[in-house]
Amino acid sequence: MTSPSLRVLPCLAIAFAYTIPRAAHAADPVASISFVEMAEQAPAARDADPTAAGISAVGVKAAAAAAARPTDILVLFDTSASQMGDFRRSGIDALSALLDAARPGDRYALAAIDVECVPLGKDFGPARGPEMTRALQSLAARTPLGSTDLVRGLLKAAELFAPGDRPRVVVYIGDGPGVDGVEPAEFAAALDTLRARRIAVTSLGIGPQINWPLLAALGHATGGMLVIPGENHEAKAAGTRTGSLAVQAVIWPEDSALGAAGKAALRMLPSRLPPLRSDRESILLIEGPVKDAMLSFAVDADGARKPVQLTLPAPVVSPDNAFLGELARNARETDGIFLPILGREGLSLTRAAMVGEAATLALLSRQAEAAGSHASAVRLAEASLRRDPDNRVAGIVRTVAQKRAVDAPPPPAPAFDVPQGNGELAELEAMRRVRGQQLERETAVRIRDARQLLTTDPERARSELKEAQDRVRLDPDLDATARTTLLAQLEARI
């Protein structure tokens, strides 16, 4: 998918390759079902994972935009080590534009986040008031250090809001957690806290390696959004857009339940209906037959609790949605809290990412088959086909490897018991090695290009090398030895 210059997940009007019915299928004065789509599995994918059939994506939207009320906005500005140089300047530009576009009735506060969340002011106030001026001065004095503990920061941020009925919003500016990621139990607890206190989190992705899947999952679970500036450094435009999106009205459904027609069994991922907005879908993955199923929940409307019931229509079947089976398969263990399906574009980006994984796995399967490891080749090819049934390389390799595995003589018994590893973990480790090797090659090319550039534009050469250095330092796929070697080479050139 080609990246737009300013990506908003999912507000840009983008025409996707799959068919999306434009009319709402089931409506209520509060919410409506905007689309229901199902994965049409190719035989190759069905053979690779027979349990993945019957996965539907369902889009739910608030029926109409409610009037946005005066809001309290806490800006979490990432001051970790990744936010240096141009990234720091872009973040400051975006923050300045966000504050300049603030509405008169909104109140703002600023906090820094790295290994912990540190408030930079005493209270919420006008976007360009004296309290914010002092907070911005404190921010300018902070040196980017450490990593980003986003979960801990969000829990601290939730405590900074005063009691009352004003809408609460967190705007995070940064690239998200680094190589360590977040623990599922801790992330789930943070989401529970944010939801209980009705705090929507909108993120502005700025940094060398934006963890967009996690930031998208955070926005999906809390009724927020995600904006990622393009390569043209449009930080100010992104800041203005982020500020506008962050204060849009959010509906907080409670007691959500999914009832199947007849005796069919259904499972919803995530298991709780996310908050609803009128400017994007809240997307659910549903396992099982969805036609005539009933999605019910309650909302606060006009000072009273209002029940809502939406009947799901028959899904539109599309082969482009075959990735939904593997997406749901990967999400079951964590109850769907990490699903990055932030509206339709989030769904499309997720598909593109999984197709990329399928290509990597297909390459690994071909390498395994060339080395005579037929069983590994079959396993890797099937993992590729679960993500992208149209991957021809994986389909051919699987067919060839299965035939050769049958024809090959049985291997000799090992002299000692060999423990069997987890198949999925082996796949991920193999993918990690390939991506690490690719980064090593890319770094070597960048060093060579910088050497050629040195005689004509030494400042640009140094900047290119420092960008490569940041990427090597933060990339999760490099092993420690390769990382140390590459960093030493880059440091010597710099």
Language-model-detected regions and their locations in the chain:
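Bacterial N-terminal signal peptides
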Residues: 8-22
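Short beta-strand-loop
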Residues: 28-36, 107-138, 155-161, 180-185, ...
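An acidic, Ser/Thr-enriched
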Residues: 29-46, 54-57, 64-74, 98, ...
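Extracytoplasmic/secreted envelope proteins and their assembly/folding machinery
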Residues: 55-57, 88, 92-99, 129-136, ...
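Von Willebrand factor
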Residues: 66-126, 150-158, 166-174, 202-206, ...
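Second-shell loop/turn segments in exported
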Residues: 76-87, 121-125, 138-146, 176-178, ...
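VWA/integrin I-like adhesion module and closely mimicked acidic/polar interface patches used
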Residues: 176-229, 237-240
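Alpha-helical, heptad-rich or low-complexity scaffold/stalk segments
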Residues: 351, 355-494
